[in-house]
Amino acid sequence: MKRIAIDAMGGDNAPKAIVEGVNQAIEAFSDIEIQLYGDQTKINSYLIQSDRVAIIHTDEKIMSDDEPAKAVRRKKKASMVLAAKAVKEGKADAIISAGNTGALLAVGLFVVGRIKGVDRPGLLSTIPTVTGLGFDMLDLGANAENTAKHLHQYAILGSFYAKNVRGIANPRVGLLNNGTEETKGDPLRKATYELLTADNTISFVGNVEARELMSGVADVIVSDGFTGNAVLKSIEGTAISIMGQLKQIINSGGIKTKIGASLLKSSLYEMKKTLDYSSAGGAVLFGLKAPVVKSHGSSDVKAIFSTIKQVRTMLDTNVVGQLVEEFAKETQVND
């Protein structure tokens, strides 16, 4: 049985969306147990009772505007902190939260702990593309500043995730840059390019420009955390704007526009699915001793369900256990 600890109080739509997502997951998957951390009365308002769902009551929670590290230190009974402690103590196998990103990174690093040999765990997310296959990108903001060694390690982590969770036999790795030529980029990108080219365990396809990301040019995209986060927000904003503009055009158009939209309804629905990040699950702080997954702050029921499904797959494939073994081998070789 896979045991998943969930911060029921994190996110814009908590606890309603969190609990209703859990209800759907419990019905869909018979091999999971959920531990919900938060206000018991509020949780029970939405929970469909199940012997595979436990509520661990606490009145304390970390707010979206709390200073992350300080909040984790001071709010020791916060729902997010208690969920992370459950993982550390072996009472749960993974943690999910839609709450304060910085706080989740802090509890991930300082409570759950990083895998020996991993310098900087990266925030990884699977982003939908027009091909329908998507790509994994990291770092998406766990680390604002990185070295070439960190980015090289992100390529290793991303490839490992793509192979073991998404089932891609030989993931193509691209380096996000301001041009595709080998000589492009700042010193960080140039140094990273050399490291990735020299590593024959990685299928490196070279530099990738931001405009190429959605075309499926690579399965894994490597970036420093500052740039990666900015690109992610840009992709999300563009997708929301496109769908909003389409809706506005259809609603304000004449009868011909509405008839055309009706005829294209299934195609427009497929387009919406392609651009919908909620079906891809959450962002994984990859490189820790257990799955720590950040669901979007505005997650709805569908997004929470997808994140639970994603974590279930991670536990099913034992991707973290395999990663621990992989880095243990590298550590032995380096020693």
UniProtKB/Swiss-Prot annotation:
Localization annotation: Cytoplasm
A GO term, aspect molecular function: phosphate:acyl-[acyl carrier protein] acyltransferase activity
Protein EC: 2.3.1.274
A Pfam family recorded for this sequence: FA_synthesis
Main location: cytoplasm
Keyword Transferase belongs to the record: yes
Keyword Repeat applies: no
Record's signal peptide: none
GO biological process: fatty acid biosynthetic process; phospholipid biosynthetic process
Superkingdom assignment: Bacteria
Alphabetized InterPro entries for the sequence: FA_synthesis (IPR003664), Phospholipid_synth_PlsX-like (IPR012281)
Keywords, in A-Z order: Cytoplasm, Lipid biosynthesis, Lipid metabolism, Phospholipid biosynthesis, Phospholipid metabolism, Transferase
Catalytic activity: a fatty acyl-[ACP] + phosphate = an acyl phosphate + holo-[ACP]
Entry GO CC: cytoplasm
Associated pathway: Lipid metabolism; phospholipid metabolism
Enzyme class: transferase
Gene3D superfamilies: Isopropylmalate Dehydrogenase
Family, similarity comment: Belongs to the PlsX family.
Subunit structure: Homodimer. Probably interacts with PlsY.
Function: Catalyzes the reversible formation of acyl-phosphate (acyl-PO(4)) from acyl-[acyl-carrier-protein] (acyl-ACP). This enzyme utilizes acyl-ACP as fatty acyl donor, but not acyl-CoA.
Record's protein name: Phosphate acyltransferase
Native species: Streptococcus pyogenes serotype M1
